Amino acid sequence: MFDRLQAVEDRYERLTELLSDPDIVNDSKKLREYSKEQSDIQETVDTYREYKNVKEQLVDTREMLDSEKDPDMHEMVKEEFNLLKAQQEELEERLRILLIPKDPNDNKNVIMEIRGAAGGDEANIFAGDLFRMYSRYAETQGWKIDIMEATPNPMGGYKEVIFMINGQGAYSKFKFENGAHRVQRVPATESQGRIHTSTATVACLPEVEEVDVEIHEKDIRVDTFASSGAGGQSVNTTMSAVRMTHLPTGVVVSMQDERSQIKNREKAMKILRARVADMYMQEAQKEIDATRKSAVGSGDRSERIRTYNYPQNRVTDHRIGLTIQKLDQIVEGRLDEIIDTLILEEQASKLERLNDDL
């Protein structure tokens, strides 16, 4: 572990030199890249330096303890030694956690896609409930919600809703929502009082900047068409709707939320970039983690991750076996207990892997 920490500190010092180099200062791309890299390891380096300082103090205090003859002074030095020892152990644990590989996307905004799946109208109504739940949670975090595309369901909810949540660390909180969500309840239209089971799928993609993934203009086909409203009737004859196809991957995005074709192009490009990056990332992750399973599931869109049982006021996250009898609070956006537990489980899993590698 300490060889790895020393390598991190050496890299930090090298980055400090690079960031003072006039050639780097005048290269905005490299300057941004190196500044971010240094910022990402700043806390690890600071903690490691504090650890080394405490370790030196321990050596000095140990020598004093061995040589001190006066009983009162010996007791004082012993107390100081014990405090430093406890501090050293605490810093060691912090360093282990800081060495856990970080998701480079954690600080990004998140693009979320919710779709009604099995269950017809009830599935679409549930998709609307999930959108409301996530919106409420985002509001408690002080994050902004921007609906990018929505297809309302005549009976309520959404057949599909795509939205962005803008806020520092939004992706780190929502990334565990990837997968199929199941609801068990009596629909409003059910006259016999029978419980129905329906599902909705959730996809969470980090917002991707142009510098993060390169998409060439020649690889995109853009088609324009008139926007359509409920029932398919034309509501806009200015051909403002846009369909973008990324030819190498076959990823398609349609956007007609805005009256302006330019704005629809901008929104479509954001989603396209995120989906293409996600596809590449998923492929790479499959190769890297072919023999490893995540503590909180695979992240596959089809994986059933959670059940919302209304009659029993129960929510169960199947990935970690967590059951909470607070469905009424959770659907109002009080997701902290679930999200925090998932984050801790993922950290514990990564820490276990790290300990195996050290």
Curated annotation (Swiss-Prot):
InterPro entries for this protein: PCRF, Pep_chain_release_fac_I, Pep_chain_release_fac_I_sf, Prokaryotic/Mito_RF, RF-1
Free-text description of this protein's post-translational modifications in UniProt: Methylated by PrmC. Methylation increases the termination efficiency of RF1.
GO cellular component entries: cytoplasm
Keyword Amino-acid biosynthesis tagged: no
Modified residues (N5-methylglutamine): Q233
UniProt-recorded Gene Ontology molecular function terms: translation release factor activity, codon specific
UniProt key word Lipoprotein: no
Cellular localisation: Cytoplasm
Keyword terms of this UniProt record: Cytoplasm, Methylation, Protein biosynthesis
Protein role: Peptide chain release factor 1 directs the termination of translation in response to the peptide chain termination codons UAG and UAA.
Family: Belongs to the prokaryotic/mitochondrial release factor family.
Protein's UniProt name: Peptide chain release factor 1
Origin organism lineage: Bacteria, Bacillati, Bacillota, Bacilli, Bacillales
Gene: prfA
